[in-house]
Amino acid sequence: MQVTAMDVYRLLPKTNCGKCNEASCMAFATKLIEKEVTLDDCPQLSGDERQKLENLLAPAVKEITFGPEENQVVVGGDEVLYRYELTYYNPTALVVDLPDDLPSEELLNRAQRIMELEFERTGEKLTLDAIALRNRSGSPEKFAEAAEAISKLNFPVVLCTFDVEAMKAALEVLGDQKPLLYAAREDNLGEMAELSVSYGCPLVLFSPGDLEEMKNLSRRLRSLGVTEIVLDPGTFTGEGIGDTIDNFVMIRRLAVEDGDDDFRFPIMGIPALSRLTVSDKIEANIREATVAATLMNRYADILILAGTEIWEIMPVLTLRQGLYTDPRKPQAVDPGVYEFGDVDENSPVILTTNFSLTYYTVEGDLKSGDVTAYLLVLDTEGRAVDVSLAGGQLNGPAVADLIKETGIEERVRDKVMIIPGLAAPASGEIEDDTGWRVLVGPRDSSGIPDYLDKLASE
């Protein structure tokens, strides 16, 4: 059952002291539910009441952190099965494989590429999250050398080996950066648990295709003092992808719907395994990206990839960005006037809405077309042109208010405004309420540069 603000309020001091910077304890309770504040913000909380609140507010899937303190990765924290029920928290961590037997220069170059890979979409920089250092050499010494080399990068690391001695050697040089340890299984459970507790590092539990065994091993790990666990039920690709999806879904259902403490942990998938049966590199990249997208849509909190080609990574990062936006909050930019190029009193004025995807699409088209113009961004509550037109947010009075608030009228000589083609039905109303001449522009912002060239030649 979902926790309400009243459930939280009953356990708060109810003094309305304001030390949390909220007007009342009820307001603080509401923000706790929305995860906008933390229990640490209430100085009067202590003892049993705080513990009760921690238990009450604990998400269905426990949050796990790994990586250096100033560059930590947080995974888990979800409370629902379906995004529309609330939202998803803590985007899937995308981790890239780095074998320890690469020549030292190549090892560092690949690590640097992983760290620096990024692209911008709708104003947000999308990047990879961590390196998976894999003990491909089978040598504890080689594993430790590679761990020491990448420790200087101060970047989150997943240490991948079933060999306890190799894990020990790597932790001696990297343990203070809280790497994620991969992995414990039945034959090394006790030793890996001891390392996890000793170094304070989270531990992956590997039990391929057997959820009953996973449940038993998870319980044993917790009895040994391991509190931060990640579950890997195995990534079977090809004809086995259906079994993989079933296992991921069952684990998350057991956590969210049944509250099964043995499964209330983040899930790891390894799309890199899809490469094992493919010889063609391009086909391998495509298959890996497909598996990554599939598992991300089915509750994967951490994914280990092998490819670093930007054309493979881009769709996975784009899917993650879309999946982890909050459906309760429209994605919007600040309304107002934005300048492109060296504007003056003769520069055209273009109208658009403050829906993020709309704004950044228009921005990209104006920049790529080397357009000099004023861009008026109307507050449509984060809705696109056609949606805001239908919903009544894009209207004459709203545009008139925007003109007044921005002072754009004093910055241009001619009162001429270009509106999106989809906003044509509102052109007359905008003209009447603003007193400006309204021109209906192209339906797609990619046509703006040619449209302006045509206007200038008339």
Swiss-Prot record:
Q: Which domain of life is it from?
A: Archaea
Which InterPro entries does the annotation name? 4Fe-4S_dom (IPR007202), Ac-CoA_synth_d_su_TIM-brl (IPR016041), ACDS_complex_subunit (IPR051069), AcylCoA_decarb/synth_gsu (IPR016218), AcylCoA_decarb/synth_gsu_arc (IPR023427), Dihydropteroate_synth-like_sf (IPR011005)
Name of the coding gene: cdhE
Q: What is said about its interaction partners and assembly?
A: Heterodimer of delta and gamma chains. The ACDS complex is made up of alpha, epsilon, beta, gamma and delta chains with a probable stoichiometry of (alpha(2)epsilon(2))(4)-beta(8)-(gamma(1)delta(1))(8).
Q: Which GO terms describe its molecular function?
A: 4 iron, 4 sulfur cluster binding; iron ion binding; methyltransferase activity
- State what this protein does: Part of a complex that catalyzes the reversible cleavage of acetyl-CoA, allowing autotrophic growth from CO(2).
EC no.?
2.1.1.245
Any one GO biological process = acetyl-CoA catabolic process
Binding, [4Fe-4S] cluster: C17, C20, C25, C42
How the cofactor binds, per note? Answer: Binds 1 [4Fe-4S] cluster.
Q: What is the designated name of this protein?
A: Acetyl-CoA decarbonylase/synthase complex subunit gamma
Keywords in alphabetical order, please: 4Fe-4S, Cobalt, Iron, Iron-sulfur, Metal-binding, Methyltransferase, Transferase
Disulfide feature: none
